[in-house]
Structures are given as structure tokens and as C-alpha cells.
Amino acid sequence: MTMNGRLLYVVGPSGSGKDTLIETARRTLPDDVDVKVARRTITRPVGHGAEQHLAVSEYRFELLAAAGEFALHWQANGLRYGIGREVLSWLKDGTTVVVNGSRLHVGEALAIFPDVEVVHVDAEGTLR
């Protein structure tokens, strides 16, 4: 896919601070900076973790995936994660898009978005 914008694919182990880093950046960037954070669709109830995701059932997730509603989706840690197709139009329009991704699925992201920029976040175990 040709992108006019930038896709930042943030990865790292659970507890490394990805959500905190993404949310802090979102809140503190100046209004004139064209950055959007993709909201993930996840097969987990709302309220687990800091991320404000769209919670769906396994069945609903499967319907969305089959209908092509995700630009990217994967399974990790017993859950399913999806990034909505709206990111495609954001990137086409020149927006920088931040995605909270999966280390194990960087290859899939690269296959779909060859110009993706992977940001690896890590913290020592004592900081988690």
C-alpha cells in the first residue's frame, strides 16, 4: 500500500508502558500535529488495562474480519486484535497513525505496510 502518512507500529512486552507512552503522546502533542491513534478492536471486556479499545465477542470479531473491516488483525495472548480500515484513509491523507501492535506479528504489518516504522518499547522487569 502506498502511504502519504507514516505508520508507527508500537510493540513490546506486556507491562512495558506502550499504552502509557501512546496516551501521553496523544495528550501532549500540539493540536496542529496530524497524528491519530488507532483504536483497537479486541475480544476482551472494556476495563482490562489502560487502553480504551472496542470490546467485541469472538463471533463479532470473526464477522468483522470476514467482512474485511480490519486493515490488520492478529491473535496473541488468547485474544484477537484488529485495526480498523479507517487507518488506510488516514495514511492516504498524510496522517501519522500510531498502532499498538504485536511483536510476533511485525511481519504481517510489514507485508501490508512496507514503509511501517516499528517502535520497540521495553522496560527492565523492575520497572514493570
Sequence positions of predicted segments:
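ATP-binding Walker
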Residues: S16
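Walker A/P-loop
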Residues: D19
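P-loop (Walker A) phosphate-binding loop of NTP-binding proteins
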Residues: V11-P13
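ATP-dependent small-molecule kinase phosphotransfer cores
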Residues: R40-V97, G101-H105
